[in-house]
């Protein structure tokens, strides 16, 4: 293609008679669409015609763009006296072009809108990612609240809190302090209400959402595994769903979070628990059988003062230890989950 361009430039008497479509213009003086009127050559083009062919013969493997770069650099280094004959030739060609095409008007090609399209696609992708990742962000914030709440009951029982933290992957020194736990509880209650409003009673949706967003932090993964996921597999259903007959620390934490979050959420999770049989590994009695009074006290510690006196909240608090104690007898004699 480049050799054809060079040959047509060299063998044509005037630039306006070229049939090359490198520089397009309107069909003002030509009968055929291919014979378009080109702009008259400037001084550099007049000079570079012979130089381009000479350089191409000396370096046959050199690309035409590299030849143009070298010719441009060489043209800049030339003096005005050396450029004068080529400038005069360019003026003559321009005058000839104006005589042959008096109504010629240069209309440059419109710039392609590829950049605008790219910006539009990137903006749409960002919006999709933002809308899809909203649930993950909420779950991540909720996971931080779970981690802080897991470490808060150290004063009530060190072995119980240590077993909760060990089963969920947090170390004992990761989150400490009642103040941080209370603040996290308030934030997690809002996030849980938002999540339940978007996906009521659907734990499997959170499960698929987690796989579509692998960039979520690891604590969020643990929170989903213990609180929000639901799997139809019978051997892992109690661990992945919110079954109260699973791990002691997990079920206790889940009921605590559900009672604080919303009454509708615990109702939906309770329906999931009752509809599916569960198989869970045996857990030591001291790690999953806290006193019901201590349980209600620890749950009510995170409730606001306005909700503490609410009869619906009190009924949920009474229902939690009963539901928890009734499920402790169905755990013994089962196979532990060795694949987790």
From Swiss-Prot:
Keyword Transmembrane helix included in the entry's annotation: no
UniProt GO cellular component terms: nucleus; transcription regulator complex
DNA-binding feature ranges: 37-105
Tissues where this protein is expressed: At the 3-somite stage, expressed in the forebrain. At the 12-somite stage, strongly expressed in the forebrain and weakly expressed throughout the central nervous system. At the 25-somite stage, also expressed in the lens.
Motif (9aaTAD): 297-305
Annotated GO biological process: brain development; negative regulation of transcription by RNA polymerase II; neuron differentiation; positive regulation of transcription by RNA polymerase II
Swiss-Prot/TrEMBL keywords: Activator, Developmental protein, DNA-binding, Nucleus, Transcription, Transcription regulation
CDD domains, A to Z: HMG-box_SoxB
InterPro entries: HMG_box_dom (IPR009071), HMG_box_dom_sf (IPR036910), SOX_fam (IPR022097), SRY-related_HMG-box_TF-like (IPR050140)
Cell compartment(s), UniProt: Nucleus
Polar residues bias: start-end ranges: 14-32
Domains (record comment): The 9aaTAD motif is a transactivation domain present in a large number of yeast and animal transcription factors.
Function according to Swiss-Prot or TrEMBL: Transcriptional activator.
Record-given protein name: Transcription factor Sox-1b
UniProt source species: Danio rerio
Lineage of the organism: Eukaryota, Metazoa, Chordata, Craniata, Vertebrata
Gene designation: sox1b
